[in-house]
Amino acid sequence: MSKELIVSKIENGTVIDHIPAGRALMVLRVLGITGREGLRIALVMNVDSRKLGKKDIVKIEGRELTPEEVNIISAVAPTATINIVKNFEVIKKFKVSPPEVIRGRFKCRNPMCITNAPREPVVPTFYLVKREPPLFVCAYCGRYHELSDLI
């Protein structure tokens, strides 16, 4: 494996590393990043990794992810590591974990849930009930969802 960089370092922003191979696009989707935001985004897929065999990497220049965004990544990339970069240096590094509460990001899979009624201005809300594997319950109808089922 070559030691040269495939994608250059970023000055300020977020690097999402150790994403399971083939899941980088899903990470962008759960973050709501479409590419139209004007951010410089670097995506590297299926690179060699001692830890995972193969992995994906996402670099987002000029944006630091919120704690909620960081933890929502665990839905599609439970092995991900988040690096916050300032002046080309990593200033914070942490692993993702399922959030305690998810509000307004996903729809309840129960078609009869009040959150799916077109005339009801109710924000879908899910509470974590089990960490491994992550299991959530809808605050309104009580239906259980695995985190990966919500995306």
From Swiss-Prot:
Keywords attached to this entry: Metal-binding, Pyrimidine biosynthesis, Zinc
Disulphide bond pairs: none
A single MF term (Gene Ontology): metal ion binding
GO cellular component, one term: aspartate carbamoyltransferase complex
Residues spanning the membrane: none
GO BP field: 'de novo' pyrimidine nucleobase biosynthetic process; pyrimidine nucleotide biosynthetic process
Function: Involved in allosteric regulation of aspartate carbamoyltransferase.
Protein's name in the database: Aspartate carbamoyltransferase regulatory chain
